[in-house]
């Protein structure tokens, strides 16, 4: 008896999936079949310029020779051992992660959610260690409005959106949400009851919102005053997406703990929690663990990803290409009143529209034309393209969006006084 799914059309595949899978995602009506460089191809051969990279995962695009080589060689050698034995890959990737983050120790896992869950557990364990040493510190977390940290019961507790938390209530207690970049609210909420402040340096799901330097400095100072930990979530913004290895490296602030995932292993599931020596002393053998985390296969690919980003100068390329992309989006904003704001740095960009309906229309029409990105926070189009994106490819996307916007509203030009006038 065959177990193959007999489907020949997208509609048949959709029907089969609706019967067989737990329905946790609303998918776009596209069946992707293969990829090459920055392009994806659907089952009918249509080509798409990928400006989302699997929600920030495929930073080196598709079929990169360094990644293909690492996958092939390691698959032929050793895929899994468990964490009961040594293998060289864990030390090699940990060395690279401590170098690029400026931190001291690494916990390897399988996803961003797992990395964040480890960070939360570490913060609670560290507070317990401090209490055993006679210090006064509690178990409360301060998180930010519009934050997204994952979907496990701990990480979703520090995720702000009510729709993500309510179905699973009561979630983990002891979390208070602070308005984004509101230093007065942060100071008012902070006390010896707090074991950690949790921050996305550049919010992704929340609409591409930077933390301010002043807020981050204040958070660091408050944590230093009591021994609480500063947790910086770099799952989406890290690994070079903003032109630095971590987005916090744009500021004069170091975290106690940071979390990395998404592009870390080029599409192979992997996450990492990286922390200071002080924070790490709270974990002892047996307190936390993972069966698959840090396996030889994922480590080999992650090593190849980091080395390729270095050797190909992709941090500089992301900075230059991202600056150009943002400049072109701002030119569209100047021309079309539909765009409210352009936000982001490097290749983590949000284009915010005044109208959710317009944002939805642009997104759907661009997809039909062969461009992949997504819409978040209703009005924001989110762009997380592969790091190898070129200016020519950006120009193609900008022209397409300009054409669609022009059909919606008359373009806007500047008169000699600098004021906008409709043409």
Model-predicted segments: where are they?
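Conserved N-terminal phosphate-binding loop of PLP-dependent enzymes in the Aspartate aminotransferase
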Residues: 2-423
């Amino acid at each position: 008896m065959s177990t193959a799914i007999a489907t020949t059309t997208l509609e048949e595949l959709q029907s089969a999936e609706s019967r067989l899978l737990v329905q946790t995602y609303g998918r776009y009506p596209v069946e992707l079949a293969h990829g090459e460089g920055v392009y994806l191809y659907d089952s009918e051969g249509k080509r798409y310029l990928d400006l989302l990279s699997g929600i920030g995962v495929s930073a080196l695009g598709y079929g990169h020779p360094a990644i293909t080589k690492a996958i092939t060689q390691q698959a032929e050698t050793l895929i899994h051992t468990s964490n009961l034995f040594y293998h060289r890959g864990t030390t090699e990737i940990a060395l690279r992660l401590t170098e690029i983050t400026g931190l001291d120790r690494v916990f390897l896992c399988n996803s961003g959610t797992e990395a964040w869950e480890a960070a939360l557990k570490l913060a609670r364990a560290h507070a317990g260690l401090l209490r055993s040493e006679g210090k006064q510190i509690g178990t409360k977390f301060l998180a930010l409005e519009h934050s997204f940290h994952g979907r496990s019961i701990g990480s979703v507790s520090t995720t702000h959106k009510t729709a993500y938390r309510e179905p699973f209530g009561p979630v983990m207690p002891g979390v208070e949400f602070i308005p984004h970049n509101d230093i007065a609210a942060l100071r008012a909420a902070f006390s010896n009851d707090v074991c950690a402040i949790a921050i996305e340096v550049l919010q992704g799901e929340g609409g591409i919102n930077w933390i301010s330097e002043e807020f981050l400095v204040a958070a660091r100072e408050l944590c230093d005053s009591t021994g609480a930990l500063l947790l910086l979530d770099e799952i989406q913004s890290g690994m070079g997406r903003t032109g630095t290895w971590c987005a916090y490296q744009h500021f004069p602030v170091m975290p106690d703990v940071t979390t990395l995932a998404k592009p870390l292993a080029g599409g192979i599931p992997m996450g990492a929690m990286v922390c200071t020596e002080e924070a790490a002393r709270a974990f002892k053998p047996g307190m936390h663990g993972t069966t698959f985390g840090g396996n030889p296969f994922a480590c080999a690919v992650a090593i190849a990803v980091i080395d390729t980003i270095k050797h190909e100068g992709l941090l500089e390329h992301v900075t230059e290409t991202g600056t150009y992309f943002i400049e072109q989006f701002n030119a569209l904003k100047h021309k079309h009143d539909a765009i409210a704001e352009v936000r982001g740095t490097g290749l983590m960009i949000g284009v915010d529209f005044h109208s959710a309906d317009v944002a939805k229309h642009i997104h759907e029409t661009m997809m039909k034309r062969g461009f992949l990105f997504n819409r978040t926070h209703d009005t924001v189009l989110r762009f997380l393209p592969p790091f190898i994106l070129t200016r020519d490819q950006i120009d193609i996307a900008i022209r397409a969006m300009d054409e669609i916007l022009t059909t919606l509203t008359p373009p806007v030009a500047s008169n000699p006084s600098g004021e906008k006038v409709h043409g």
